């Protein structure tokens, strides 16, 4: 069996060299603020058009859903958009916010994508931000513990996961929670 190899980095998620970079998005796939705004600035404006086309095909996304588009960037091929915030019609107030269950669902959906993507690849490299910890207001420690539990399992493909903490303090929290992994 193979597993996930964890690398922890501090800095700008979009400067990572990877096959796939995860975008903390929303159910309307709008490149708005936070990580999504960074995608908007880093990738060509064609990214939003591609996201709009994916949403047309999907009709409606739920929190935790994952969709892929071309990245339109030089340092990674695929942008994997995770619906973290719920901006669907009729959703108000706190109902827009993610829960830890949203993160668990998202990780399972990311893994399904990785499994299919890895079929004809030696190794896959994915960069991941702290989903739900910006506008979503989830506690970083809680999300990182979910990551640790999820990524410490064996899987049938070879994948390096780059966990990116934007600030020094984020990096330190990730490092301290992950440091006892082999």
Question: How should each PLM-predicted stretch be described?
Answer:
Residues 1-182:
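Macrodomain-like recognition of ADP-ribose-binding/processing modules
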């Amino acid at each position: 069996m193979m597993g996930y190899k964890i690398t922890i980095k501090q800095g700008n998620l979009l400067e990572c060299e990877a096959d796939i970079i995860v975008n903390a998005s929303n159910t309307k796939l709008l490149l708005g603020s936070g990580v999504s705004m960074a995608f908007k600035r880093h990738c060509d404006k064609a990214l939003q058009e591609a996201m709009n086309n994916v949403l047309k095909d999907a009709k409606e996304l739920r929190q935790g859903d994952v969709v892929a588009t071309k990245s339109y960037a030089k340092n990674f091929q695929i942008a994997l958009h995770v619906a973290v915030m719920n901006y669907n019609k009729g959703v108000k107030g706190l109902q827009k916010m993610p829960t830890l269950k949203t993160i668990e669902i998202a990780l399972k959906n990311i893994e399904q994508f990785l499994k299919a993507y890895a079929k004809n690849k030696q190794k896959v490299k994915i960069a991941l931000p702290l989903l739900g910890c910006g506008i979503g207001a989830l506690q970083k420690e809680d999300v990182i513990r979910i990551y640790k539990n999820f990524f410490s399992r064996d899987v049938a493909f070879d994948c390096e996961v780059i966990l990116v903490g934007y600030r020094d303090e984020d990096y330190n929290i990730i490092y301290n929670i992950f440091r006892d992994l082999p």
